[in-house]
């Protein structure tokens, strides 16, 4: 499956499972990057740190995500690197995972897009 771009993600915001694979502090906006004009996360996203994702067994990941096998999952981080790793892990576990390459670095620059 291909990466997802800003326009598609914004259009499908309420229907997608979105994983923010940044740290908890980046997710809640208490420790973001100074290059981003806004802090927080994409509304509806669940925080699942990529390092934790890599530490868990496949069974633990399936249990925590609680998604059907083959479910479409979008991963994002700050700039697309951690989410690329998460996407590969999720694909290896049978999910239809897509990377939002622009990630928070792109999303936070669009004042017309919601932030949680």
What are these regions (language model features)?
Residues 1-17, 21-74, 78-116:
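Rhodanese-like catalytic fold shared by cysteine-dependent sulfurtransferases
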């Amino acid at each position: 499956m291909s990466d997802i771009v800003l326009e598609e993600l914004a259009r499908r915001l309420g229907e997608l499972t979105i994983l923010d694979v940044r740290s908890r502090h980046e997710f809640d906006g208490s420790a973001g990057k100074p290059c981003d004009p806004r802090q927080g996360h994409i509304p509806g996203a669940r925080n699942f740190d990529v390092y934790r994702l890599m530490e868990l067994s496949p069974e633990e990941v399936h249990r925590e995500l609680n998604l059907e096998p083959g479910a479409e999952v979008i991963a994002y981080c700050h700039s697309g690197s951690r989410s690329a790793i998460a996407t590969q892990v999720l694909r290896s576990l049978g999910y239809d995972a897509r990377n939002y390459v622009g990630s928070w670095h792109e999303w936070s620059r669009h004042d017309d897009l919601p932030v949680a």
